[in-house]
């Protein structure tokens, strides 16, 4: 179906709760009865004031549907480990998974590629049929020897297991332990085979556990010369997918010392210094909450979740962070806010009249289905539907603080459901992932790819709001939408 610009401009006002509930029921009629009952638990309309979204989450997708989720391998390698710039990350298995994981997600960094940084390079054991039959441990060991010879300045190696490794039972832990002793540097095995768990969320957990067991805890007492200050913080869950250095910059402007960051533009020593932090600051809670809670329990380091999308949330987060420290930090936080306020005001003045009242449907992973809502609202836009690829119940609980009543909630939405909801609700903008991008554009909907800022960005941080506003305006108000028509029309 093609939606013209005229259709979008004449769409009805925000629907009431009963109408959206009817839309859910109508959409589910296309499914077999048993599956419809199962999917109904993942769809709901949020009622104002409730502390729950009342949707089931973190449950396996049903085989045969077009799910938007990724796998455990994507969560471990593609999200958490790959941005660690001075370690070599081996995709252990067939070449395809490693290629798409490496090429599909950006992670900006400072360094010389192939000398002291390796993020954009693809290292694979290139499993073949004979490796499935005879095992791949010897091949993995040989690969590590070659990498150590070719890249002696690397600070370590991680092994990211693909599906065949778990199926044939290779002992990557034994190989890693042996090579770590030979090389004198960490060699970290990750049992992140794609068939494990529900989604990429398990991969985050596996990566967090390997950081804890192989990097953080073993090095916790190896910093005798570390000079601590009262203002030491660690930045966690910030992956620098589009040059997102702004978060660190504004934290330093308010007087804090960022002693470690994980894992965007992060050297491996970042995690080893984290145990000395006075406060952990979480950007993406879902992907790093496991290691954060471990650090709270073992090292007594508290944490705060922050949101640097849009001026309203930036100011709110800065003041929350500053309240943990003394008055000098609180004063500097206010000075930082005052510094950027004119810039934010100018952005709102320019773009809000062009975007006021425009409706948005979100479906992303990690934090964006909730965190970006404030930035859209700063521009006068209204989020009418949102959901998580791999969210857990606590993600939806926190989202209730961001959304309004009558917002459509969809967990692990199927391709059919997402298209049907958009067709009926007629949003002015759909913000989701690369798999959805071209489908909705062919339907005539303006679209922004929110996993990697649609190859633009950054969208968060003090300077990111201007780019965010420009890109939303560029998508929504592009005259091409008045000319487009679905290819099958």
Curated annotation (Swiss-Prot):
Residues spanning the membrane: none
Cofactor binding note of this UniProt entry: Binds 1 [8Fe-7S] cluster per heterodimer.
Annotated positions binding [7Fe-Mo-9S-C-homocitryl] cluster: 284, 451
Pfam family, one: Oxidored_nitro
GO molecular function, one term: iron-sulfur cluster binding
PROSITE patterns in alphabetical order: NITROGENASE_1_1, NITROGENASE_1_2
Residues the entry annotates as binding [8Fe-7S] cluster: 71, 97, 163
Cofactor list: [8Fe-7S] cluster; [7Fe-Mo-9S-C-homocitryl] cluster
Single GO BP term: nitrogen fixation
EC number: 1.18.6.1
Record keywords: ATP-binding, Iron, Iron-sulfur, Metal-binding, Molybdenum, Nitrogen fixation, Nucleotide-binding, Oxidoreductase
Catalytic activity: N2 + 8 reduced [2Fe-2S]-[ferredoxin] + 16 ATP + 16 H2O = H2 + 8 oxidized [2Fe-2S]-[ferredoxin] + 2 NH4(+) + 16 ADP + 16 phosphate + 6 H(+)
Subunit structure: Tetramer of two alpha and two beta chains. Forms complex with the iron protein (nitrogenase component 2).
Family affiliation: Belongs to the NifD/NifK/NifE/NifN family.
Function as written in the Swiss-Prot or TrEMBL entry: This molybdenum-iron protein is part of the nitrogenase complex that catalyzes the key enzymatic reactions in nitrogen fixation.
PANTHER family per UniProt: NITROGENASE MOLYBDENUM-IRON PROTEIN ALPHA CHAIN (PTHR43457:SF1)
Protein name: Nitrogenase molybdenum-iron protein alpha chain
Gene name in the database record: nifD
